[in-house]
Amino acid sequence: QGVTERHGDEATFRPVPSAGARHAFETYLYCRRVEALEEGIYRYLPLEHRLLFEFTEPGLAARISEACFGQRFVGQGAVTFFWSVIPYRMEWRYGPAAHRVLPMDVGHVCQNLYLSAEAIGAGACAVAAYDQEALDALLHLDGEEEFVIYLAPVGKHAVSA
C-alpha cells in the first residue's frame, strides 16, 4: 500500500485500488521471523514507506492464534499482516455506501499481498475468522474508530512429502 503518487494534500495513489482514493486502511504486521527486525508488532507508514515498531510482549504468537479461534498457523508464519479500517475516511465522502465498498477495497489489498507472496515463492492465507474484540485489543485499537477487518499470515510453502 505504499504511495506511488501524491496529488497535493488531496489524495495519494497506491498500487491497490481504493474507492475515491480514500485508502481507509492501516497495515499492521506481526513480524516473527523477519531478518533484521525484532519480533513484534509494526505499523506500515505508507508516505515514508517504512515500518514503525509499535510494541512486543511475551506470547504474541499464541495470543494471535488464540484470537483467531485457535488457528495456530496465523501466529506461526514469518509475518502476519493485519488490516484495520478507519471507516470515517470513506464515510465522509460516501455516507452509508461506504460500508459496501470497504470489503471490496480490503480484498484488493489482500490480493496484492497474495501476488507479492507468490512472486517471492511464499504463500499467504487470508483469514476473516477471529474474535473482533480480542484482536482489536491485541493491536491496541479502540474497536470503534479503528478496528481489524482482515488479516493474512505469510510464510514459506509447506513442503510436500
Regions found by a protein language model. Name each.
Residues 137-144:
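Short proline/glycine-enriched turn/loop segments at secondary-structure junctions
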Residues 118, 144-146:
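A structural signal for short secondary-structure junctions
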Residues 3-4, 117, 156:
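A generic secondary-structure signal for well-formed alpha-helical elements
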Residues 41-43, 80-82, 151-153:
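Conserved hydrophobic/aromatic beta-strand scaffold that supports enzyme active sites
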Residues 1-76, 161:
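N-terminal amphipathic, basic helical "cap/leader" segment at the start of enzyme domains
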Residues 56, 147-161:
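C-terminal helix-cap and adjacent tail motif
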Residues 27, 81-83, 87-90, 94, ...:
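Small-aliphatic-rich amphipathic alpha-helix that forms the alpha element of a beta-alpha
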Residues 32-34, 86, 157:
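Solvent-exposed coil/turn segments that connect beta secondary-structure elements
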